[in-house]
């Protein structure tokens, strides 16, 4: 996939979320089952002895803040109850993050930045990455849920995961979900309809499906025939290659992350998302 086509896919998704922020947020209310196991693993690794220090959570592509709301409730009922909490969210769509029906108003010590995440990462030189990419302190827990499937090409997915690792303190936890939607026959049909429609009415100038890589698809939205989202379906080998790619970026030869867990969760099947839990070295 060439850079221009990747940029067009990113803009396609940015436009989708700007135009459909309210309707999308309305369908994203309940916490994902996989988040509970994610937090259980994270809390096993975080030392409760430093309770006077803030516990910081960083969320890349935070959407309507429903993970922050879940994490606040989960942390408040854990051994970290009473510990100062700080939440840092980054997203390219402020309308989604501050949606009136969302959770932003409920979260204390919430710091939100509107950032074109992929546009920012595409401009950086992978050989000369800054220590941190986003304006936030190093986090105890860094997460990225429901976003990696919107990142075109393996090159940029590695950059996203690398940026997430850099935003995490040594010993901190990094959690990512990978959407495996093509294992769902309903989603297979939905993608087929959207891609057939795109052949007749291209979603943007220069649309060329031959640029797609294995696992790349277009998906529509509700009954809006003009709405498209670029999404990537992951398999386990691609996820392994992604984690390996982040390790390859290390400048001192040490692996910047180690894998703690990998599991399926969510959806009617319980296998809609593949979660990977890493620990920063």
Where are these regions (language model features)?
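Class I (Rossmann-like) S-adenosyl-L-methionine-dependent methyltransferase catalytic domain
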Residues: 1-58, 63-132, 173-281
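Short catalytic micro-motifs in class I SAM-dependent methyltransferases
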Residues: 146-150
């Amino acid at each position: 996939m060439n850079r221009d086509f990747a940029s067009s896919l990113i803009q396609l998704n940015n436009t989708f979320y700007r135009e459909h922020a309210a309707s999308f947020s309305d369908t994203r209310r309940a916490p994902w089952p996989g988040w509970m196991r994610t937090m259980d693993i994270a809390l096993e690794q975080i030392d409760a002895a430093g309770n006077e220090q803030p516990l910081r959570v960083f969320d890349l592509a935070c959407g309507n803040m429903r993970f922050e709301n879940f994490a606040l409730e989960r942390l408040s009922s854990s051994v970290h109850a009473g510990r100062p909490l700080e939440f840092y969210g980054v997203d390219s769509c402020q309308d989604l993050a501050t949606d009136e029906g969302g959770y932003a108003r409920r979260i204390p010590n919430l710091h939100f930045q509107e950032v074109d995440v992929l546009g920012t990462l595409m401009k950086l030189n992978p050989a000369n990455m800054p220590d941190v990419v986003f304006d936030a302190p190093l986090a105890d827990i860094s997460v990225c849920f429901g976003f990696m499937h919107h990142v075109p090409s393996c090159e940029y997915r590695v950059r996203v995961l690398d940026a997430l690792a850099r935003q995490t303190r040594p010993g901190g936890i990094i959690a990512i979900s990978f959407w495996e939607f093509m294992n769902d026959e309903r989603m297979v049909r939905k993608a087929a309809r959207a891609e057939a429609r795109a052949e007749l009415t291209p979603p943007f100038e220069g649309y060329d499906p031959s640029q797609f890589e294995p696992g790349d698809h277009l998906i529509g939205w509700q009954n809006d025939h003009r709405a498209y989202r670029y999404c990537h379906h992951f398999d386990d080998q691609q996820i392994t290659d992604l984690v390996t790619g982040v390790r390859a970026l290390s400048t001192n030869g040490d692996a910047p992350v180690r894998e703690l867990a990998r599991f399926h969760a969510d959806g009617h099947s319980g296998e809609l998302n593949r979660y990977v839990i890493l620990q920063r070295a």
